[in-house]
């Protein structure tokens, strides 16, 4: 208990903050999940993925639908507002509804706390202090506070499952249970398919084959039957009802643009920024552009829209092949050297590649990179320096999700305090045996650059521009954050291939 008391105290303190935030701003995701409670409670299972009573149709895999169903019956039996369970009560909100839904996020986040506890206890004695700091760092994530406890989602629960499966993937733990939990996680939210290749290669290499590549047929049978059983448990009813095509059409809507309406800070944000600058600048130098393309067209995130004014348009297939090629490169190292740390690096990089180069990526997906990378961040100072621009850029890029004035103090103070904590970790990260030029001062200068950027976005832009160029502050933040995230990606990629063991 003693070594974990700091983690528990941090969890208790943060829970008070989260309860205090119950009345705060709620995004449309709050109504999305209320509607899913209503659908799974009031409609037969055959209608779950067919219902279009609300525009917020069920588009998560079956395990998440089952979870919403269980939550709905808990709400029903414990006397919460039953009107929230009526699918025809569109945009319904009541104090009881808010308390139940906000409270369910906090309770389910205990899975994350348990996973972090297991991570600390499974670490070597000499690494436990840093593991504890990492656990606190993850649980106090500004991203989880913003996205889950204000904006409204269940990422703490989902990433708790991911981190628990990562911890169990240590050879001395329970790799079969790790595979089972990760398979279940995919059946909760299919975005985790991005990192599935790393699990496949690692489990194949370590669990299904001996170090000299002799197949272990019993392990292959156990692994295969476990994974298949979990997917049958999730998708079995829809297989029986012959509704798999309908279910998949909800899970994978391909008619969206390359970028979300608010550009995620990835490679395509940089690409879009260059396109917009070229559109504005080239005509001044006598270059004729296609006047049929509006400056508002590039990557606004609208359905079916992904055209550019100057640069070539990007088809979905190209993003797939870029991600596939880069992930294969990462997986080759994992196949050759299948250690647990290399596995964590591969999970991080597979998620990172999908975030940087994937199609229609949401800014919230940056959690798939930051949280796994946190496990590696205190190996030594090189990893910490690679982590810092990612974490700072990623979390600051989430702040525009909260655009109401009442939430401004908490989002800036909490995120600022977390960044200040991160900047003190130099004392904890070991100095590497192989000294390299870490560009520490460059990283600090880059992070400091967010200060004038936010001053401009929050105060100067409105005074100078008025109602013109409303997209400019978001574009500047997304583009500047993308540089830091891309630089961190290159840094970890270098360490992954040259150092990680």
Swiss-Prot record:
Q: What is its EC number?
A: 2.4.1.265
According to the UniProt topology, which residue ranges lie Cytoplasmic? Answer: 25-59, 117-131, 178-180, 337-341, 411-412, 465-473
Asked if the keyword Membrane belongs to this entry, the reply reads yes
Residue ranges of coiled coil: none
Q: Which GO terms describe its biological process?
A: dolichol-linked oligosaccharide biosynthetic process; protein N-linked glycosylation
List locations, semicolon-separated.
Endoplasmic reticulum membrane
Cellular compartments per GO CC: endoplasmic reticulum; endoplasmic reticulum membrane; lumenal side of endoplasmic reticulum membrane
Disulfide topology = none
Which GO molecular function terms does the record list?
A: dolichyl pyrophosphate Glc1Man9GlcNAc2 alpha-1,3-glucosyltransferase activity
Major enzyme class: transferase
Which keywords does this chain's UniProt record carry? Endoplasmic reticulum, Glycosyltransferase, Membrane, Transferase, Transmembrane, Transmembrane helix
Primary place of residence?
A: endoplasmic reticulum
Q: Determine the domain of life of the protein's source.
A: Eukaryota
Per its UniProt record, what InterPro entries does this chain match?
Glyco_trans_ALG6/ALG8
Spans through the membrane: 4-24, 60-80, 96-116, 132-152, 157-177, 181-201, 316-336, 342-362, 390-410, 413-433, 444-464, 474-494
- Pathway info: Protein modification; protein glycosylation
Positions on the Lumenal side per record topology: 1-3, 81-95, 153-156, 202-315, 363-389, 434-443, 495-501
What topology does it adopt in the membrane? Multi-pass membrane protein
Name the PANTHER family on file. Answer: DOLICHYL GLYCOSYLTRANSFERASE (PTHR12413), DOLICHYL PYROPHOSPHATE GLC1MAN9GLCNAC2 ALPHA-1,3-GLUCOSYLTRANSFERASE-RELATED (PTHR12413:SF2)
What function does the entry list? Answer: Dolichyl pyrophosphate Glc1Man9GlcNAc2 alpha-1,3-glucosyltransferase that operates in the biosynthetic pathway of dolichol-linked oligosaccharides, the glycan precursors employed in protein asparagine (N)-glycosylation. The assembly of dolichol-linked oligosaccharides begins on the cytosolic side of the endoplasmic reticulum membrane and finishes in its lumen. The sequential addition of sugars to dolichol pyrophosphate produces dolichol-linked oligosaccharides containing fourteen sugars, including two GlcNAcs, nine mannoses and three glucoses.
The family line of this record is:
Belongs to the ALG6/ALG8 glucosyltransferase family.
Q: State the protein's name.
A: Dolichyl pyrophosphate Glc1Man9GlcNAc2 alpha-1,3-glucosyltransferase
Give the organism, scientific name.
Schizosaccharomyces pombe (strain 972 / ATCC 24843)
């Amino acid at each position: 208990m003693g070594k974990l008391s700091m983690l528990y105290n941090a969890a208790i303190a943060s829970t008070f903050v989260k309860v205090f935030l119950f009345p705060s701003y709620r995004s449309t995701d709050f109504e999305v999940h209320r509607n899913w409670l209503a659908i799974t409670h009031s409609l037969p299972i055959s209608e779950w993925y067919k219902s279009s009573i609300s525009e917020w149709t069920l588009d998560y895999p079956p395990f998440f639908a089952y979870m919403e169903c269980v939550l709905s019956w808990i709400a029903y039996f414990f006397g919460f507002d039953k009107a929230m369970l009526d699918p025809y009560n569109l945009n319904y909100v009541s104090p009881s509804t808010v308390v139940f839904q906000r409270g369910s996020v906090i309770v389910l986040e205990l899975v994350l706390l348990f996973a972090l506890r297991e991570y600390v206890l499974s670490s070597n004695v000499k690494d436990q202090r840093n593991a504890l700091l990492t656990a606190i760092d993850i649980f106090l994530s500004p991203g989880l506070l913003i996205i889950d406890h204000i904006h409204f989602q269940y990422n703490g629960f989902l990433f708790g499952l991911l981190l628990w499966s990562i911890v169990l993937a240590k050879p001395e733990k329970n790799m079969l249970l790790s595979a089972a939990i990760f398979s279940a996680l995919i059946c909760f939210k299919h975005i985790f398919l991005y990192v599935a290749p790393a699990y496949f290669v690692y489990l194949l290499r370590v669990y299904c084959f001996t170090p000299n590549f002799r197949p272990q047929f019993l392990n292959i049978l156990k692994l295969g039957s476990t994974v298949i059983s979990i997917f049958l448990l999730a998708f079995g009813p829809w297989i029986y009802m012959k509704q798999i095509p309908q279910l998949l059409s909800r899970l994978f809507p391909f008619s969206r643009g390359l970028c979300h309406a608010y550009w995620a800070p990835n490679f395509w944000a940089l690409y879009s920024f260059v396109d917009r600058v070229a559109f504005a600048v080239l005509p001044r130098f006598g270059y004729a552009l296609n006047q049929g393309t509006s400056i508002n067209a590039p990557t606004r995130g609208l359905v079916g829209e992904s055209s550019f004014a100057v640069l070539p348009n990007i088809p979905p297939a190209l993003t797939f092949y870029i991600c596939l090629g880069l992930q294969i490169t990462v997986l080759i190292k994992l196949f050759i050297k299948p250690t647990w740390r290399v596995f964590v690096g591969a999970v991080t990089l597979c998620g990172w590649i999908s975030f940087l180069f994937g199609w229609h990526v949401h800014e919230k997906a940056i959690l798939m990179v930051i949280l796994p990378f946190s496990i590696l961040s205190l190996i030594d100072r090189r990893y910490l320096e690679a982590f810092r621009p990612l974490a700072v850029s990623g979390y600051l890029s989430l702040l525009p999700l909260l655009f109401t004035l009442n939430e401004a103090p908490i989002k800036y103070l909490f995120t600022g305090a977390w960044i200040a904590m991160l900047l003190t970790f130099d004392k904890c990260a070991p100095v590497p045996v192989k000294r390299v030029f870490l560009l520490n001062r460059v990283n600090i200068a880059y992070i400091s650059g967010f200060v004038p950027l936010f001053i401009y976005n929050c105060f100067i832009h409105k005074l100078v521009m008025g109602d013109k160029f409303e997209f400019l502050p978001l574009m500047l933040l997304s583009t500047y954050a993308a540089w830091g995230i891309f630089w961190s990606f290159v840094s970890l990629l270098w360490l992954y291939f040259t150092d990680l063991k």
